[in-house]
């Protein structure tokens, strides 16, 4: 069969920029291009009312977007943009800035590390790899976010065993790298841990969470490629745009 692309739309009238619902994943691909061109971007922290109807918390306001650029954004990514005749209230907005993203890459980098890079590339999000020595040497001061791709705890902490390969490829983050990550967070940075790397974050930083499947044999719990149900608080910034 033929898979049809999403069809975008332009609604409303006015010269106070455009409002973009945050529910579509492709929103972020389009916003990446807008930010790369130096546009100002804000996000609604509560429902914003327009003559075309209410838009839920998490919508993006693009005050500097021209009608021509809005049309391209709509057609290229299948998005619906609402033109505004007046700017949203300042207390209903938060400023969005392009984060400086680092992806941790160990000398035992697993396949998910490559998939993480691919996903960011698909959405036009710039990133740089950081290695053990980079983190230990203070390079995190150049970033806002560090992603720990899905990797086992020992692979991140210990890396390759001494003697198993040349010296420069041996070891992991160790205590020095863990301390650098903790200082990074304490200074306002974000660490995002995916899947198995969450175990590293929990044990290293003493987080008040527990992996309930840790230590459970695969014959007792096996969940490959499954769809599970989540309860999401769509009023929280991490849940903006999600169904409740």
Q: Which residues are covered by each model-predicted region?
A:
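Intrinsic-disorder/low-complexity accessory segments
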Residues: 1-244
């Amino acid at each position: 069969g033929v898979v049809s692309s999403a069809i975008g739309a332009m609604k409303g009238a006015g010269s106070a920029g455009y409002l973009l619902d945050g529910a579509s994943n492709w929103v972020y691909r389009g916003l990446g291009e807008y930010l790369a061109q130096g546009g100002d971007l804000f996000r609604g922290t509560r429902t914003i009312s327009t003559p075309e109807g209410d838009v839920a918390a998490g919508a993006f306001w693009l005050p500097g977007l021209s009608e021509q650029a809005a049309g391209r954004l709509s057609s290229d990514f299948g998005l619906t943009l609402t033109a505004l005749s007046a700017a949203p209230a300042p207390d209903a907005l938060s400023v969005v800035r392009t984060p400086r993203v680092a992806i941790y890459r160990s000398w035992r980098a697993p396949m998910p590390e490559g998939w993480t890079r691919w996903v960011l590339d698909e959405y036009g999000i710039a990133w740089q790899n950081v290695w053990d020595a980079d983190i230990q040497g203070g390079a995190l001061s150049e970033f806002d976010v560090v992603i720990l791709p899905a990797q086992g705890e020992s692979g991140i902490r210990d890396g390759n065993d001494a003697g198993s390969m040349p010296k420069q490829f041996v070891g992991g983050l160790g205590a020095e790298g863990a301390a650098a990550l903790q200082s990074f967070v304490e200074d306002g940075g974000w660490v995002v841990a995916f899947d198995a790397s969450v175990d590293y974050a929990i044990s290293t930083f003493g987080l008040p969470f527990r992996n309930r499947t840790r230590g459970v044999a695969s014959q007792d719990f096996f969940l490959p490629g499954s769809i599970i149900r989540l309860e999401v608080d769509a009023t929280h910034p991490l849940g903006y745009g999600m169904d409740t």
